[in-house]
Amino acid sequence: MAKFDNQICLIADDYSTARRLIKDSLLHIGFSCLEAENGNQAIAIIQQTTLDLVIADINMPEKNGLELLKDIRADENMKDLPVVLTMLEPFEDLIFDAKKLGMNDYLVKPFDVFTLSKTLDKVIKTTGGESL
């Protein structure tokens, strides 16, 4: 399993249980974690913090994962930040739209730490693994 020591991930999900489960898995593979309950909180954190990765639920209140992704890609300072979206059902049209907006990858809930690690290893290697 890949180790991601000294890398910081923002977890954006409106369900505290989902955030906790994702955080526990991320801590297990070496990430430090920050949390947001919605897309608006996530944007505020991203603008103030150096991050290596964002994992966001596609279906959140106030600003959903697609809207968050669109805002990240539109901002010159954030546009290269790797974004992995999470979802309960892998609807093809949703995945297609997210890829068009610049999603790096996605995970279908529930997922285990091995699947998370494998996905993030691929995403970090593809994007160069550098903090913004």
Regions found by a protein language model. Name each.
Residues 20-28:
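Charged docking surfaces used in two-component/phosphorelay signaling
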Residues 30-37, 45, 107:
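Short hydrophobic/Thr-rich beta-strand motif most characteristic of the beta2 strand and flanking loop
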Residues 49-55:
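Active-site beta3 strand of CheY-like receiver
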Residues 60:
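Receiver (REC) domain active-site loop signature in two-component systems and cognate sites
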Residues 111-121:
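C-terminal output helix
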